[in-house]
């Protein structure tokens, strides 16, 4: 990961956080304050954005990431690596047990349910490879999306599926291991 991958300034970070507040229903100052303090889904993406900014800022600032990682874990056992790349309007429908690894890319308007994992294949003799989740995908409860695969636009991953293959655009993958059914 290179420092300029996101070119993520404080201004961009705050802009993204404000867009997240609006996405989660913040229409005015009062509703934004309520969402900021009470909406766990927002807090998950908020802490990710702060950690991403801190990671790209400097080595010294990275020490703050220990605290941020702890906060995410306390908020329902979630772990989002600051090296992952998350787009805008990511919806965490039930933010509990969401694990997102270092090289994962999740594009805009993706919905993620509880107890989902996005990570590398874990083969010790091979370089790590991580999934890419394209715009509009929905990942249901308990799904595991593993390895250097792509879940394409508007694809659906069924509950408790283990996805080890690419999922085509506008299709559904279910099962262990997952098979394409549409």
Language-model-detected regions and their locations in the chain:
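Terminal amphipathic alpha-helical/low-complexity segments used for targeting or macromolecular assembly
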Residues: 1-76
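Left-handed beta-helix
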Residues: 76, 82, 87-88, 93-96, ...
């Amino acid at each position: 990961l290179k420092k300029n991958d996101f070119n993520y300034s404080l201004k961009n970070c705050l802009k993204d956080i404000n867009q997240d507040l609006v996405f989660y229903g913040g229409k005015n100052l009062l509703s934004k304050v309520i969402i900021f303090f009470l909406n766990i889904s927002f807090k998950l993406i908020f802490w990710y954005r702060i950690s991403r900014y801190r990671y790209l800022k400097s080595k010294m600032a990275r020490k703050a990431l220990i605290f941020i990682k702890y906060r995410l874990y306390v908020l329902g056992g979630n772990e989002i690596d600051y090296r992952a790349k998350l787009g805008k309007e990511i919806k965490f429908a039930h933010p509990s047990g969401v694990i997102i690894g270092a090289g994962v890319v999740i594009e805009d308007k993706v919905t993620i349910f509880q107890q989902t994992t996005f990570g590398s294949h874990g083969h010790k003799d091979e370089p790590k490879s991580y999934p890419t989740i394209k715009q509009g995908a929905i990942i249901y409860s308990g799904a595991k999306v593993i390895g250097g695969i792509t879940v394409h636009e508007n694809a659906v991953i069924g509950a408790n599926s283990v996805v080890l293959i690419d999922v085509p655009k506008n299709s559904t993958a279910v099962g262990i291991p997952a098979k394409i059914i549409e």
